[in-house]
């Protein structure tokens, strides 16, 4: 693994083990990142098994070529540089119409956070960027400097759940009328100055929720996850499984709702039985999310908000 792409994988064994790996199966890592889940999954595959790994960050793929070299050499892994919202079309283009399992590790990866110039972190001074795919045009700079007051309030409330959304949007509007807002430090200071003294005393960085909101907007993270998870459930073979790690309430709520819709059925009252074509296609493997162990929490601070949900295809 390259030194500039260090990443501690969260819920490593739980996420992969819950897929109930078949040695000759076809699997997908929808969020390659530091390749931790991919490496562990590949270690359980036989010579006829295969892994397709998605990431829209070329650096992640370059790193994985090094970390997973022995599996690259045996032809057991295929890397796909694309947003996982294009999961189905990419796999079908490669002749894959059915998979035995898929895992997701949602949100931004540690290497992206740690790479200062990517502009994801409110802890380091950097240009406002926040693109997971550096080839796309929309950046955090565009959101902060061109979105209307009402659009800023909308995304701050919806994606950041910050009760000071209106005050922050108004302050951004005032500052950018005088000059453009170019850096993460400038934005973090604006956010901080928009909050009450009482709020600033609370635990956690005052800019965290707003940075999350802008990042989700720039990358359409929830829209992409929604589309991809639905495609994944359609691609699963019977008895195939899907594991999803989330890191904040919006991701977890979305995953929980998608799994619920696929594992329950609404039928007209008085119907004596549920016809086969109305039966749910999925079942929940775990009713409540799996959380990191105390040992993992002590070893990896990023694991604190992680939740793992798993579902299985039943028809």
Swiss-Prot record:
UniProt keyword annotation of tRNA processing present: no
Any one of the GO CC terms: cytoplasm
Lineage: Bacteria, Bacillati, Bacillota, Bacilli, Lactobacillales
UniProt keyword terms in alphabetical order: Cytoplasm, Methyltransferase, rRNA processing, S-adenosyl-L-methionine, Transferase
Amino acids binding S-adenosyl-L-methionine: 35-37, 55, 84, 105, 112
Subcellular location field: Cytoplasm
Documented EC number(s): 2.1.1.199
GO molecular function: rRNA (cytosine-N4-)-methyltransferase activity
GO biological process, one term: rRNA base methylation
Name of the molecule in the record: Ribosomal RNA small subunit methyltransferase H
Reaction catalyzed: cytidine(1402) in 16S rRNA + S-adenosyl-L-methionine = N(4)-methylcytidine(1402) in 16S rRNA + S-adenosyl-L-homocysteine + H(+)
Family assignment from sequence similarity: Belongs to the methyltransferase superfamily. RsmH family.
Role this protein plays: Specifically methylates the N4 position of cytidine in position 1402 (C1402) of 16S rRNA.
């Amino acid at each position: 693994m390259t030194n500039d792409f260090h990443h501690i994988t969260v819920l490593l064994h739980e996420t992969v083990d819950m897929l109930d790996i078949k040695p000759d199966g076809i699997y997908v890592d929808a969020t390659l990142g530091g390749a931790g889940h991919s490496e562990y999954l590949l270690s359980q595959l036989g010579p006829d098994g295969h892994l397709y790994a998605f990431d829209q960050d070329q650096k992640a793929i370059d790193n994985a070529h090094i970390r997973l070299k022995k599996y690259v050499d045996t032809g057991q892994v295929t890397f796909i540089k694309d947003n996982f919202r294009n999961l189905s079309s990419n796999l079908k283009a490669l002749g894959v119409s059915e998979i035995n399992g898929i895992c997701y590790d949602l949100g931004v990866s540690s290497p992206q956070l740690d790479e200062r110039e990517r502009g994801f972190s409110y802890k380091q001074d950097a240009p406002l960027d926040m693109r997971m795919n550096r080839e796309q045009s929309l950046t955090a700079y565009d959101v902060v400097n061109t979105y209307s007051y009402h659009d800023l309030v909308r995304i701050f409330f919806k994606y950041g759940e910050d009760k000071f959304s209106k005050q922050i949007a108004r302050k951004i509007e005032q500052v950018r009328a005088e000059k453009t807002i170019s850096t993460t430090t400038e934005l973090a200071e604006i956010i901080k100055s928009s909050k009450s003294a009482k709020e600033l005393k609370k635990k956690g960085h005052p800019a965290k929720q707003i940075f999350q909101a802008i990042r989700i907007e720039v990358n359409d993270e929830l829209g992409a996850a929604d589309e991809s998870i639905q495609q994944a459930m359609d691609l699963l073979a019977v008895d195939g499984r899907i594991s999803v790690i989330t890191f904040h309430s919006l991701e977890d709520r979305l995953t929980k709702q998608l799994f619920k819709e696929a594992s329950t059925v609404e039928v007209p009252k008085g119907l004596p039985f549920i016809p086969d074509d109305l039966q749910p296609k999925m079942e929940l493997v775990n009713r409540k999310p799996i959380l990191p162990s105390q040992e993992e929490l002590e070893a990896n601070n990023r694991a604190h908000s992680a939740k793992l949900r798993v579902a299985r295809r039943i028809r």
